[in-house]
Amino acid sequence: GLNQGVDFVGGRTYQVRFAQDISASEITDLLSKPEVFGSADAKTFGDANQLKITTKYKVNESGAEIDEEIRKSLYEALVPHLEGTTYEQFIDLNDENKQVGLLESYKVTPTIADDIKQASFWAILGSLIVVFLYILIRFKKWQYSLGAVAAVFHDVLIVLGVFSLTYKFMPFNMEVNQAFIAAILTVIGYSLNDTVVV
């Protein structure tokens, strides 16, 4: 299967900067303890002292008090790595000169994630239909259209297959998110150009 990002399954994402370079696996283990979030994923994001932390903890619950509870749990778990940063400093997203603490946070609910999945599916399907119609009108043979769409679909299938087979082994982030969908649409564009022009 594919490693679906927060955009597609729902969850909370936090971008945190630390005082020193930090091990993503150490933070993942720390936040995955039952008394913290139960499960979390941390990945190096940009510099070696910055992590992107994702969790599905209480994703179905909403409200300011839940968000506050989760930020406090995050802070309390990370405080040994924050070099004297107070909770107020940690959560202040308006400080542009912040050296340590929370830089960004957002939440995607499962409902929004389902909407994004559907929109992505329709975007890819729509592009294949447009390709089919363009070639049908341009070359006046449905067989050419079918062949071109099959070639484009084949190219997309190869990219999806490579992602599906290798995301666990790669040392970098290979999650399926909105940027991945944009990349798939780019593959469709290049494949179409190669099929029709060449």
Identify the residue ranges that each predicted region occupies.
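A structural signal for conserved, well-ordered secondary-structure elements
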Residues: G1-V198
